[in-house]
Amino acid sequence: MMRRTLRVCMTLLCLIPGMGQTCGYDALYPNPFEQSWPGALDVAMATAAAVNDDRVARLPTLTGEAGFARSQAWLQTLKSRFQQAGVRGGVSILLIDSGLWSRLRGKESLLLQLHTAGPHPRDRMMLLSEAALDALLAGTLTIEEALRLGVVALPGEEGRQLQHDLHLALGS
């Protein structure tokens, strides 16, 4: 069972583009050893374990345009929830499965930027898997549970504030 989890994690690592690269939805995969972001492998391994333990639902694999559209819909929903909760932007988000960097920016009116080159230097950061984002938005996983499981990482000094904001936005 552990070998299977390790294989899944290594496969996910190979799909994580680096900063300034195209994402996995573009089907262009440079050297996988240049593609990692600090903490992304930990999130990938935790996600594989959570899926394996039925703590997070396994998602159907979607690639290309269909995968990008699904991720875009999730991120738009997250943006809407931030806005409804009155949470400010300044959040860079990495979906570790595809390597898709996105950004929520603004104060009263939030804007979602997809396919950004990486995190904005002053942004709070959020690393998570598609399965974790789906579960958070569906209400089957709280942000506290996601952090405990390791399927979400909020690195940096602003991580606690972002956790609080996610709690407000997701109602968990």
Predicted features and spans:
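Feature captures hydrophobic
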Residues: 20-172
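Bacterial N-terminal signal peptides
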Residues: 7-18
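Positively charged n-region of N-terminal signal peptides that target proteins for export
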Residues: 1-7
